Amino acid sequence: MTEEDGKTQGMKVLGILDIHNTPCAREAILHGAAGSVAAGLLHFLATSRVKRSFDVGVAGFMITTLGSWFYCRYNNAKLRFQQRIIQEGLKNKVFYEGTDLDPTLKKTGDK
């Protein structure tokens, strides 16, 4: 990772996915690696078949990585949506503050 003009060069996986600039990529790959080791090792201990255990490990990596990726991206999208709603609410509160349209003012029966 070299510093050039204040920017860091990201690490790429397979020359495609830039881990530092892609949200949830690092965590998904780490979870996938742990899932592949666990799935492959458990399958090997249960069956003692090396090639099949390797295949199960690769499948475990893909499933765990994709599952972790989609879960993280869903939570990020949900959080962004909630932040957008709160931001609009704050903007409306500032806009209508002190006017007759202010929803926080209690209505009295004077009118």
From Swiss-Prot:
Coiled coil: none
Location within or outside the cell: Mitochondrion inner membrane
A Pfam family matched in the record: Cox20
Membrane topology: Multi-pass membrane protein
GO CC annotation: mitochondrial inner membrane; mitochondrion
Spans within the Mitochondrial matrix topological domain: 48-56
Keyword flag Membrane: yes
Record keywords, A-Z: Membrane, Mitochondrion, Mitochondrion inner membrane, Transmembrane, Transmembrane helix
Membrane spanning stretches: 28-47, 57-74
Any one Gene Ontology BP term: mitochondrial cytochrome c oxidase assembly
Keyword Transmembrane part of the UniProt annotation: yes
Side of membrane Mitochondrial intermembrane, spans: 1-27, 75-111
Top-level taxon: Eukaryota
Database matches in PANTHER family: CYTOCHROME C OXIDASE ASSEMBLY PROTEIN COX20, MITOCHONDRIAL (PTHR31586:SF1), CYTOCHROME C OXIDASE PROTEIN 20 (PTHR31586)
Family to which the UniProt record says this protein belongs: Belongs to the COX20 family.
Stated role: Essential for the assembly of the mitochondrial respiratory chain complex IV (CIV), also known as cytochrome c oxidase. Acts as a chaperone in the early steps of cytochrome c oxidase subunit II (MT-CO2/COX2) maturation, stabilizing the newly synthesized protein and presenting it to metallochaperones SCO1/2 which in turn facilitates the incorporation of the mature MT-CO2/COX2 into the assembling CIV holoenzyme.
Protein name: Cytochrome c oxidase assembly protein COX20, mitochondrial
Organism: Danio rerio (Zebrafish)
The gene coding this protein: cox20
